Regions:
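Short, structured interface segments
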Residues: 1-4
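Non-catalytic interaction-recognition regions
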Residues: 7-477
Length: 477
């Protein structure tokens, strides 16, 4: 395809994005990463890279415990714990767990709610029953949401597997053998300051439980050394609240002999504000005080959602204006670009009826200012695509498409492909004015065919650019 290249050929990039905990629907921040991450994957592939799209599923640790506690409380119609999860979806999932268990001959609510004689409810049988049934339900819901959003992950990686397979222990032992692990205050520490971190990190707490970074250490090693598609670049896409995480992760990269910012790249995305009627939208039908992917899709659909989230540099916060993005106006950027594509398809249909064939084109006749503007815009596409890949910047594709659509709409209004007779007043004009009008409105066959070829080139680039953003290119609107 025009603009595609192989300058990243021979590189395998692991692109991990969204990776929301299986404790609720995907919120608007995760939705932004879904749009940006999948678009970035498509752009990197168009630059010749092999890309592994990966979702890291945090099914180990405290968040899952809080999720299970919340479900048990909801099932008993009790108040959800202060640090628990709230929203109608918690009641829904609790009810589904009870029904599923019942179908399997288990009365979930009758199982013991305490773990020991001291009355510690801990990892009780009942909580474990809710956890083991609810997490796969949430996982399936997340997978369905991603599929509807046109994001296909190659790997769904479960954090738990790193512990079950012994990879966490092996990774820590490897660091220990090279002198990067020490014991202090009953805990096990990673000497990350040796590799530029601002402080050393606990990896096994004094109570014997692994700290969050223990899984991250093993996971990075897994990405680099796995049998199937090991990567030479591991790209992590994280939310704004993870900024403090960069130093420790780069230390992990360096400790294993890799080059920070080369073998590991961390991209930090900023906030998304959803606006309607000039006010911030903070409520969801299902999830309480957060806007979810389903809320956004219901309001404006997949095309407008993906385009609007990918068109702003993820280093900046973005306002999603639901009124604007639902409108059929030139102010709506996704409509403006898609309309250029639909217009070009309509030109094709009219040209076919008029018997104009590209084979008759004389491209030297693309000599008007409007022709020149479109040709110049088309010529920029390969460079834009390469820069978007190198800078991990999908928004460059969106901005380019808007510029190309602008040049095309102007061209469409100035030049005709299918000849049209001059009106009586127009035909009475004299000299250069009449000649210019005649060239614009009533071109001879070689010029009309050349314009048709230019029209089709625009159509091809817009369709290709929209595909990189995961957005459809309608042929009628």
């Amino acid at each position: 395809a025009f603009g595609h290249n192989d300058h990243l050929g021979g590189h395998t990039l692991n692109l991990e994005f969204v990776s929301a905990n299986p404790t609720g629907p995907i919120h608007i921040g995760g939705t932004r990463w879904a749009a940006v991450g999948d678009s970035m994957a498509r752009i990197l592939q168009a630059n010749g890279a092999e890309v592994v799209r990966e979702y890291y599923f945090n099914d180990h640790g405290e968040q899952i415990d809080r999720f299970a506690k919340s479900l048990v409380a909801a099932a008993h119609h009790e108040q959800v714990p202060a640090d628990g999860y709230k929203g109608a979806y918690i009641d829904e999932i609790a009810a589904r767990v009870i029904d599923e268990a019942k179908a399997d001959g288990v009365d979930a609510l009758a199982l013991p709610r305490v773990r020991d004689e001291q009355g510690d409810e801990g990892a009780s049988e009942q909580r474990e029953e809710f956890r083991k049934r609810a997490v796969p339900m949430m996982f399936a819901e997340i997978q369905d949401s991603m599929k509807e959003f046109r994001v296909d992950f190659d790997v769904w990686f479960h954090e738990n597997s790193l512990y079950e397979s012994g990879e966490v222990e092996r990774a820590i032992n490897e660091l220990r053998e090279q002198g990067d692990i020490f014991e202090k205050d009953g805990a096990t520490w990673f000497a990350s300051t040796k590799y530029g971190d601002d402080k050393d990190r606990v990896i096994i707490k004094s109570d014997g439980h692994a700290a969050y970074i223990a899984g991250d250490i093993a996971y990075y090693l897994n990405k680099r050394r796995r049998a199937d598609h090991p990567c030479d670049v591991a790209i992590y896409m994280l939310g704004a609240d993870h900024h403090g995480y960069i130093g420790r992760m780069m230390a992990v990269c360096a400790a294993f002999g890799d080059t920070p910012e080369v073998n590991m790249q961390i991209l930090i995305g900023q906030m998304v504000n959803v606006m309607k009627d000039g006010k911030a939208v903070r409520m969801s039908k299902r999830a309480g005080n957060v806007v979810t992917i389903d809320d956004l899709l219901e309001a404006i659909g997949v095309d407008a959602s993906r385009y609007s989230l990918a068109r702003t540099d993820y280093h900046q916060s973005v306002d999603i204006d639901l009124n604007l993005l639902a409108s059929h106006t030139n102010e709506n950027p996704v409509y403006y670009v898609q309309y250029a594509h639909a217009r070009s398809c309509n030109v094709d249909r009219n040209a076919e009826q008029a018997g104009i064939r590209i084979a008759d084109a004389d491209l030297s006749l693309l000599d008007t200012p409007a022709d020149g503007e479109v040709l110049a815009a088309l010529a920029m596409y390969p460079n834009v695509l390469q820069m978007a890949g190198d800078h991990r910047a999908p928004h460059r594709i969106a901005h380019y498409l808007e510029d190309l659509a602008s040049a095309y709409h102007k061209w469409y209004n100035a030049e005709r492909v299918v000849p049209m007779e001059l009106t009586d007043p127009e035909s009475r004009l004299k000299g250069e004015e009449r000649d210019a009008l005649s060239v614009a409105k009533n071109p001879e066959t070689p010029r009309a065919a050349a314009r048709l070829k230019l029209n089709d080139a625009v159509q091809h680039v817009i369709a290709g650019g929209l595909k990189l953003l995961g957005v459809s290119a309608p042929d009628k609107m």
